[in-house]
């Protein structure tokens, strides 16, 4: 539940390495009170107060994706494709999907199926290297040049459904402790899938930790996740002292 509430509060935010998220100069500062009220309402009521109607689907820019979906630039030697039930189900996820290219790149980046889909993708480019990528939805086709697609650091331009934290007793390595859950859906076939993208970033860990700390100080709401992250942070061998909150109040 704490993770769900945290994700709800983060939907309005864009991670930044330089600008404090809730600084007075921040675009999001004026939304802070509404965001806090919505999350507090969700903790006390069965009917949460939402800032945006839930029936409105996200609006995507087809030419802008997050860096999570950027396919590898180095091609691997083509090998056989394993046609499994999951692979066939993924084809139904792609068929006539309005977000066909975004879904394809997500499947290529999926740690569990990337080898198969990367073979498929590289094989297609080997056969037709000059046409780029062509997507077809209900006989309406469009060509893309991968090098002209814009990849941004804001992960929330994609349909992020949640975050996972794998906090273990082993603090010698920070590898793959954060995972982004990407929700894929094909309204044409009704097929859905959630893909977990591991993301190894201490900067992102600090950003989320500070967002939670600020929210706790501002509202008094307790988070088990915050306690676990602070406990984990204090055990990291390369942290000489507990960092102070990075987000300014003024």
From Swiss-Prot:
Leader peptide range in chain numbering: 1-18
The UniProt record lists the keyword Membrane: yes
InterPro entries (UniProt xref): Cytomegalo_gL
Kindly indicate whether the keyword Signal belongs to this entry: yes
One GO cellular component term of this record is: membrane
Give the main location.
virion
Keyword list (alphabetical) reads:
Disulfide bond, Fusion of virus membrane with host cell membrane, Fusion of virus membrane with host membrane, Glycoprotein, Host cell membrane, Host Golgi apparatus, Host membrane, Membrane, Signal, Viral envelope protein, Viral penetration into host cytoplasm, Virion, Virus entry into host cell
Which biological process annotations from GO are given for this protein?
fusion of virus membrane with host plasma membrane; symbiont entry into host cell
Q: Where in the cell is it found?
A: Virion membrane; Host cell membrane; Host Golgi apparatus, Host trans-Golgi network
Q: Note the SS bond partners.
A: 136-141
Q: Which domain of life is it from?
A: Viruses
- Classify the protein's membrane topology as the record does: Peripheral membrane protein
Similarity comment text for this entry: Belongs to the herpesviridae glycoprotein L (gL) family. Betaherpesvirinae gL subfamily.
Q: Kindly give the HAMAP family that the UniProt entry links to this protein.
A: HSV_GL_betahv (MF_04036)
Assembly: Interacts with glycoprotein H (gH); this interaction is necessary for the correct processing and cell surface expression of gH. Part of a gH-gL-gO complex.
Its protein name is Envelope glycoprotein L
